[in-house]
């Protein structure tokens, strides 16, 4: 019997207004495979992915990100932390733009923390040009941000915790800014990871 995944669309302030949008808000993420994903058989039977694969805890989440605008500067928890570690990788599918990845070599911890608190943290991060076919790994504890104009396939460990360090002071449709998690984020940074990220190019087949 053949089963198909039923995707879940998630609205995000930085998302894309396209035919996949849900309601009137931009869709930023489409979750294709996660613990709550429903699988539908050719006979119409539905079952949760975690039950189908008999896997607890479910190890990964697979989704696409549709970024019309820059995502927040953020970091995910690392090893020996609570909540659990969150590694992830991005495969660039469409568009071109930049990815912020890791703290620039030679930046002191004190200078970085000051930059986070005064809103100049972007200047402290490595900037990578990204295009279809590129693959970039984001180990837990790496400060990063996806740039606008990119569509990426993201595979991550099953942890949904994100600490926002900077969000450009933007406001949602209700006029509210999104919550920042400065202290938690700084505590989650892997300070042993400095310098430019490794980027693998041409490993994902791009249309054309």
Language-model segments: residues:
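Conserved metal-binding segment of the jelly-roll/cupin
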Residues: 76, 129-148, 155-157
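Transition-metal
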Residues: 1-107, 167-204
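Residue-level signature for short turns and capping positions that connect secondary-structure elements
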Residues: 78-80, 106, 143, 151, ...
